[in-house]
């Protein structure tokens, strides 16, 4: 994919930002409307990466140097530094690009090296990796990170758009690469269910030149016995229409596809009794038309 560029017409001039919902105690959500580093334009030049907050190696893998360019980035929103667990972070990446460019760049990594990720002082992640291998990382060469939000130090989300990545792909306001990075959380209970509701989400992006949108609400049931996310329902508002997408069952810390809908998830947080689940969703309709994607964090109680 190196060096290819995607040119699309009919772009939106700005991306709508979602306000974050609730959160309590040390799980307070930081909304996307916050501006990074106190800069009204949300712009940082030659940023200095901040290492994850705890339990991490400070030495990034030399094999992944190409995924850590010293680029010029702009930010919209802010997030806390995400806490690692024994040097590991959970990483979810969902590209919303035409399939020929997005291929093999979806990441669902419940335990990835914290030293392979780059989180800026603004809270934005500009390098993402599923392992320490050179082939398993993707960096932002230059451009915007928007809809940056977090839930305490448990998880942060955002979207790369109006940007170019280290694969050489460029993308627009309505496209992008969505991510969620959180503290890996092992579940201890082996029976029962938890009700999950939407806590924070980024914008719904379009693979091609369709309208971007918002995720109005999300709900699901977490089955502690089967370790699955059941009856996931996503309510989408895009353009002048609203519709619902459903996934009957998908594995926690895994990937499932039903029809045109693919669901990725990682379990994150600090309380096994009240876990958070970062969910990535994407669709790939037949004939290469349409297709949307995004990320959402669910609070399960």
Locate predicted features.
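Bacterial N-terminal signal peptides that target proteins for export
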Residues: 1-10
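Mature soluble binding/inhibitory domains
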Residues: 22-301
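C-terminal motif of bacterial Sec signal peptides marking the signal peptidase cleavage site
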Residues: 17-20
């Amino acid at each position: 994919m190196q060096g290819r560029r995607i040119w699309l017409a009919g772009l939106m001039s700005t991306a709508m930002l979602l306000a974050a919902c609730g959160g309590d105690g040390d799980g307070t959500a930081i909304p996307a409307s916050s501006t990074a580093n106190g800069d009204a334009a949300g712009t940082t030049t030659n940023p200095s990466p901040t290492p994850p907050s705890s339990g991490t190696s400070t030495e990034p893998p030399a094999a992944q140097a190409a995924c850590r360019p010293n680029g010029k980035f702009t930010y919209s929103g802010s997030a806390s530094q995400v806490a690692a667990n024994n040097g590991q972070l959970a990483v979810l990446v969902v590209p919303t690009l035409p399939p020929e460019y997005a291929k093999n760049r979806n990441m669902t990594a419940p335990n990835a090296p914290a030293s392979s990720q780059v989180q800026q002082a603004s809270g934005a992640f500009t390098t993402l990796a599923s392992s320490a291998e050179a082939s398993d990382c993707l960096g932002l060469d230059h451009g915007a990170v928007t809809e940056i939000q977090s839930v305490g130090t448990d998880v942060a989300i955002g979207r790369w758009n109006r940007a170019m990545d280290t694969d050489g792909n460029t993308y627009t306001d309505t496209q992008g690469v969505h991510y969620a990075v959180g503290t890996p959380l092992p579940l201890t209970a082996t029976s029962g269910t938890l009700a999950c509701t939407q806590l924070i989400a980024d914008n719904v992006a379009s693979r091609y030149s369709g309208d971007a949108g918002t995720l109005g609400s999300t709900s699901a049931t977490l089955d502690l016995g089967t370790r699955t996310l059941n009856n996931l329902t996503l309510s989408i508002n895009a353009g002048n229409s609203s519709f619902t997408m459903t996934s009957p069952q998908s594995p926690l810390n895994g990937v499932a596809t039903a029809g045109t809908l693919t669901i990725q998830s990682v379990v994150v947080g600090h309380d096994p009794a009240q876990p958070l689940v970062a969910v990535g969703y994407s669709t790939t309709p037949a004939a290469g038309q349409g297709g949307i994607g995004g990320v959402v964090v669910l609070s399960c109680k």
